[in-house]
Amino acid sequence: MIVGLSNPKKKYHKTRHNVGSWYIYSLAKNYLSILKEEKKFFGFTGCLNIKSNFIRLLIPDIFMNINGFSVHRMASFYNISLNQILIVHDDLDLAPGIIKYKYSYGHSGHNGLRHIIKEFNTKVNFYRLRIGIGRPKNKNEISSFVLSIPDFKEMKLIKKSISYAIKENFTLLNLIQ
């Protein structure tokens, strides 16, 4: 299962905090998968078949700080454990254009991840794809920064990193299996 963390509503779609959903939309488009609204999972879902691996996709359609409800609901329904899920999210500690895969336990201050960990109520490592969005100079501006739209240069770097990450999914699938 691959989850792209996001906030709902059209006004947040292009914000830095929603880069996880950008990834899922790009991945679905790349593999000709259709995302559809699934109210029982509080989000949009799809499926991929990559190298004979059936992979479920999820974009929660609820606010970031409660994305765990959506992730846990879908994972429980399909009997998927947290360590079998790739969570794709924005990362303030990486510059735009930088991505990093991580397999560990923890949220690094990210409220979406924090809520997922709370909902699963288990201390296990899980996969994360961290997509760099950069950090504002003033730490008091973090909330407004993540809820703002990247400038043209940043957007180009972020989209390029997402394209690269999608090409590297085959490598990641070998790790998950």
Curated annotation (Swiss-Prot):
It is found in: Cytoplasm. The keyword Endoplasmic reticulum does not apply. It is an enzyme of class 3 (hydrolase). GO terms for biological process: protein quality control for misfolded or incompletely synthesized proteins; rescue of stalled ribosome. Its EC number is 3.1.1.29. GO terms for cellular component: cytoplasm. The active site is at H17 (proton acceptor). Signal peptide: none annotated. It comes from the Bacteria. The record marks N7 as: Discriminates between blocked and unblocked aminoacyl-tRNA. The record marks D90 as: Stabilizes the basic form of H active site to accept a proton. It catalyses: an N-acyl-L-alpha-aminoacyl-tRNA + H2O = an N-acyl-L-amino acid + a tRNA + H(+). TRNA binds at Y12, F63, N65, N111. Keywords: Cytoplasm, Hydrolase, RNA-binding, tRNA-binding. InterPro entries: Pept_tRNA_hydro, Pept_tRNA_hydro_sf. Its main location: cytoplasm. One of its GO terms (molecular function) is peptidyl-tRNA hydrolase activity. Monomer. Belongs to the PTH family. Hydrolyzes ribosome-free peptidyl-tRNAs (with 1 or more amino acids incorporated), which drop off the ribosome during protein synthesis, or as a result of ribosome stalling. Catalyzes the release of premature peptidyl moieties from peptidyl-tRNA molecules trapped in stalled 50S ribosomal subunits, and thus maintains levels of free tRNAs and 50S ribosomes. This is Peptidyl-tRNA hydrolase. The gene is pth.
